[in-house]
Amino acid sequence: PLKYAVYDGRQLALKISANSVYGFTGAQVGQLPCLEISSTVTGFGRQMIESTKNQVEAHYSRQNGHEHDAQVIYGDTDSVMIKFGTTDLAESMRLGEEAAGIVTKTFIEPIKLEFEKVYYPYLLMNKKRYAGLLWTNTTKHDKMDCKGIETVRRDNCDLVKEVVETSLRAILIRKDPQSAVEYIKGCISELLLNKMDLSKLVVTKALTRTSDQYASGNKQAHVELAARIKKRDPGLAPAVGDRIPYVMIKGAVGAKAWEKAEDPIYVLENNLPIDTAWYLEHQLSEPIKRLFEPILPDNVNSLLEGDHTRRIHKATPTTGGLMKFAKVTKQCLGCRSVLKGTDGALCAACEPKQMEVYCTKLKTVQSCEQLFSRLWTQCQRCQGDLHKDVLCTSRDCPIFYKRKKVQKDLRDAKDVLRRFDADW
């Protein structure tokens, strides 16, 4: 075992060294550019994949007495994926081991093709994008393996990752595509009605350089936002290397993406409306289409349009734009009619229902207090002390934005409740 471990470590070191040298030779700009070497390496790889494909498909065919015609459905770099046609897991593993042995005999030593795993079920979207349940034994799947899709990518908001992962679990594990369809429609409806938690809509990107170091015509959302934050408060200005969180808010017609990016805390404090259409079009639509095109080839657009997309929430901003010139008037808390010349809570018509309206607003305050207490206690447990203030400012934590939002909601709800003081 010791000798094997030494040799295994040695061959791994050689492999990493060879990979590094290959990377150097394939780089257009660098210390060791030599495209002939890198092209030769990839050429041999393609040749071996093609040879493997031809051997497997020729050997495992009905003409040779097999039950199904095998098909190599995917090949990339140093691996191939074979569809043997059988639905029996144990038989697939046996055929995989057997095929690896047959192909290895045709390779020059020490090149060896090894059987690694079985995907069942398996969803291949396109090159370098696939997902499936990974099996290395016949008793239980090891995990749900995803490559190149939004569950493992960092350039999407958490909503996209959650939607894709939940849908994949419904399709692959529960084998219930219809429940995935209903879930997608429900999420889109929640998004358009502005019921989605803000933490799920936050996009983060690394600030690799300052705004003046980018080309003048290449404005990026997170870079421009960093410059705006610096103007508002130089003490909060992000530094190069920081990850900038932002959400997209509604802007003027034809506004660019970099003009609509805004700090999530600033959005919460100023009640700025989220551009839900942008999230649907630029974040959700393509991943959903890629995921469901193999399942609903003729009806995939029904996920993005229909009854569930017809109700849209329109938020009212409290600052900026025309609100600078608007005069805020108080409304009756019962019927929402405009109150003239009074600081009270209700109009004359709603005065008889004063206690009923008050109890409704009081329940709102109590609900916010309960939610805030739960989130506050959860943050205290996380920092390891239930008797100190929460000092955490980690924006990567999903509770952070929930806590900030419920703090604002609680303040607003208490302000509403105080309006009854003028009547009593």
PLM feature segments, named:
Residues 26-43:
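Gly-rich Lys/Arg/Thr-decorated short loops/hinges at beta-loop-alpha junctions or inter-strand turns
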Residues 2-17, 42-75, 82-386, 394-424:
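DNA-dependent DNA polymerase catalytic subunits
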Residues 16-29:
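Active-site-adjacent bridging/hinge elements
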